[in-house]
């Protein structure tokens, strides 16, 4: 997937990586763009946008399926069987609907979601639907910028493909010392400076920026890890993959704050 994201970024405006999927194009957060195709995977996904990468960059959807996944089945796709039942879905046949069956991809830089680098005052009790869990203020601020409904996960498509700019619900939610949560893009590591008085020592390299990871969750739809003992294979922006063991107060992404966020948002 690393080379797929790099290829996409090389041809996209501003060298951006693909946005998060959110809703499939026939569904929407408030009103369905196409009411002729209903009740088929009509919920948002925490994976890369299928319409952005398939089939031009991602030629085989099985790349998105982890052999060790604890979820039943693989990536979901609109099929001829669905079109036979509902002809309005014919134009979407072959499109990916649920690219997050094994891995999660957010499309934004998350750099403030580990108790190693934030304080207890930077943690928020986020409620989504009937669930309430602790997430970092940065994740909560991004959530409120993206969702169309405050207490439910209904991401707006336009928000998923843009930088999230302050003011935020919670202060200091931007990446580094900025007032922006950046979309993933080539060169974005330049904005990750945490100490303006010593930028050379406090910036991040692409090898430290999270792109994609195995699903993990403390609750909700995904209570199991893909790999036992608990941990995740993590893809970083420079293309390397590393296995990270789960630690509640560990590094991003294999920690309690990220696991809580995925538990709240994954379906």
Regions found by a protein language model. Name each.
Residues 2-267:
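Short, well-structured segments within or immediately adjacent to enzyme catalytic domains
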């Amino acid at each position: 997937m690393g080379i797929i994201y790099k290829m996409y970024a090389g041809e996209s405006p501003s060298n951006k990586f693909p946005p998060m999927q959110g809703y499939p194009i026939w569904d929407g957060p408030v009103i369905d763009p196409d009411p002729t195709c209903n009740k088929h995977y009509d919920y948002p996904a925490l994976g890369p946008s299928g319409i952005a990468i398939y089939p031009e960059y991602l030629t085989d959807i099985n790349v998105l399926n982890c052999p060790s996944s604890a979820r039943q089945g693989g990536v979901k796709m609109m099929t001829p069987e669905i079109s036979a039942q509902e002809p309005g879905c014919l134009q979407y046949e072959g499109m990916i609907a649920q690219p997050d069956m094994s891995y999660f991809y957010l499309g934004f830089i998350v750099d403030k979601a580990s108790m190693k680098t934030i304080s207890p005052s930077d943690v928020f009790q986020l409620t989504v639907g009937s669930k309430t869990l602790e997430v970092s203020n940065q994740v909560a601020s991004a959530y409120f910028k993206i969702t169309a409904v405050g207490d439910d996960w209904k991401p707006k498509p336009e928000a998923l493909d843009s930088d999230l700019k302050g003011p935020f619900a919670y202060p200091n939610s931007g990446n580094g010392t900025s007032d922006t949560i950046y979309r993933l893009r080539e060169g974005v590591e330049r904005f990750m400076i945490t100490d303006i008085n010593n930028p050379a020592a406090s910036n991040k390299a692409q090898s430290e920026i999270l792109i994609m990871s195995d699903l993990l969750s403390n609750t909700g739809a995904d209570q199991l890890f893909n790999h036992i003992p608990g941990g995740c294979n993590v893809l970083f922006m420079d293309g390397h993959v590393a296995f990270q063991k789960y630690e509640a107060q560990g590094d991003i992404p294999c920690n309690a704050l990220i696991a809580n966020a995925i538990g709240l948002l994954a379906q």
